[in-house]
From Swiss-Prot:
The active site is at residues 103, 196, 228. Homodimer. Catalyzes the hydrolysis of N-formyl-L-kynurenine to L-kynurenine, the second step in the kynurenine pathway of tryptophan degradation. Kynurenine may be further oxidized to nicotinic acid, NAD(H) and NADP(H). Required for elimination of toxic metabolites. GO terms for biological process: 'de novo' NAD biosynthetic process from L-tryptophan; L-tryptophan catabolic process to kynurenine; positive regulation of cell growth. Belongs to the kynurenine formamidase family. The main chain amide nitrogen atoms of the second glycine and its adjacent residue in the HGGXW motif define the oxyanion hole, and stabilize the oxyanion that forms during the nucleophilic attack by the catalytic serine during substrate cleavage. SUPFAM superfamilies: alpha/beta-Hydrolases. This is Kynurenine formamidase. Pathway: Amino-acid degradation; L-tryptophan degradation via kynurenine pathway; L-kynurenine from L-tryptophan: step 2/2. The keyword Hydrolase applies. Keywords: Hydrolase, Tryptophan catabolism. One of its GO terms (molecular function) is arylformamidase activity. Pfam families: BD-FAE.
Amino acid sequence: MSSSKLLKYGSDDLQTIRVYRHDSGNHLSIIFIHGGAWRDPRNTFNDFEELVGKLPSTINTFGINYRLSPAVKHPAHLEDVVSAIEYLAKNYKVENVGLVGHSVGATLALQILNYKTILPGLERPLGIKMKFLVFLDGIYDVPKLVEEYPTYSSFVNEAFKTKQDYMRATPVSSEMPQFDISVEKCVILLVQSTEDELLSVQQTELMADFLQAKSIPFEKHLGAFGAHEQVYRHHKVAKLITDAIGANLDGLVRARPQN
């Protein structure tokens, strides 16, 4: 998209944000978080270009890049995502937000909900209201991932210093306090392709069980959405996100004060 531009939220070359579309008159923003096993430089905010083109122009759209392993370890990836969101909240007045995360981007989206617990000493609010969360073929329980796919320990060990660190990485694998960001009235979508060659449905089922145990409403969508790196390009996934956008825009319009 030729109209997009890049922003820096830190000194590292990877601490960048792609602004796909921004209009101060828009009331809803989507922030995309890419996957790539915390380490693959081939996965970037550019992954979502095709998806953005299928979404309504009445929303702001941003993509986040973050530092990769093994150069950095957990929780540096989350620190970067938090910093990027804070940058957008401060400089672009982003308030009503939907997060879309793919693979470990979904992990990071989940971690955002407990960012104060995972990042000790960070007590300040992010300045956003979470309107919807879309988890695409995500990783939610790292210990269970390694148990199911022992060879995946290679990239997990690059991203985390110790086993204890990745056991405590998300609220699904470790008991954590209530979320630091409210998900009340937040639309939550769990999306999993049955054609994913890298992740079985187990991670999505673990996440669904977690949300059910917390009595948090969600929608689960299993379908033939393509291979792991095709899910976020699939037209049916774009439709699911568009529907979540529509529900939120309707609510925001109704909530606007009348002149």
